[in-house]
Amino acid sequence: RALQKAANCSLGARIHVEKRIPVGAGMGGGSSDAAGVLVGLNRLWETGLTRAELEDVGLTLGADVPFCIRGGLTRTRGIGEAMQELPCGQCFPLVVIQPCGGLSTRDVFAAYHAQAVSFRPDNDAAQAALADGDLRALSPALGNVLQPVSEQMRPAIADAIADLRNCGAAASLMTGSGSAVFGAFETEQSADAAFAALKKRYDRVFRCETCMESVIEQI
């Protein structure tokens, strides 16, 4: 309906969304679904909205939707609407684990705001490391201010991050508000080996890689 209103369009559609991103994982599954539907309907209905216009519509649905429409690597400010596109030296092999049940984003943020959290990641250093494709330099610059809060709610998150590092991940962190965590590896072979080992310990383990394409380019 948001797209119908923005494009002054009365057409409809029967939509089936096959979800592959785990629910309650902090990976933007719902936001990416919304982005894909907006882009698909814009093409199906031939409404002709630009990417920027689709991002504006997406922002009315969720803070992460504009990024999911744009894709690639961005440095994001505000609630998600101010995006600076960044160069990336390479795509990284990943192993993603959802070690426990999902977390409520609202509950995590409520607990975060109730605490005094002074830690901040070094975004400038992370940006430089990503531009160089240097995972070893990236690792100490990474941080997720929500991670300590989510680990208190689900201690298995910290265990999974440790398991990824023990399996050779050059960088490992919680995604979003949790409960999923990822490990970035320097080679496909090391990621494959970690994936094989971790499948024996966890039910929900995924082998993937970073992607520099947007939803618009994939559909």
Predicted regions mapped to residue ranges:
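DPxDG-like acidic metal-binding loop motif
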Residues: A25-R51, F67
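Solvent-exposed beta-strand sheet faces enriched in polar/charged residues
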Residues: R14-E18, V57, C68, R77, ...
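Short pre-catalytic strand/loop immediately N-terminal to key active-site residues, enriched for Gly-Thr
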Residues: A13-G26, G168-S172
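Conserved, helical-rich catalytic subdomain that frames metal- and/or nucleotide-binding sites
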Residues: R70, R75-A171, E186-K199, D203, ...
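Phosphate-handling active-site elements
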Residues: K5-R14, V39-T60, T187-K200
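N-terminal pre-core extensions flanking Radical SAM catalytic domains
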Residues: M174-E186
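Helix-rich "cap/lid" substructures immediately adjacent to catalytic or cofactor-binding pockets
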Residues: R1-I21, A156
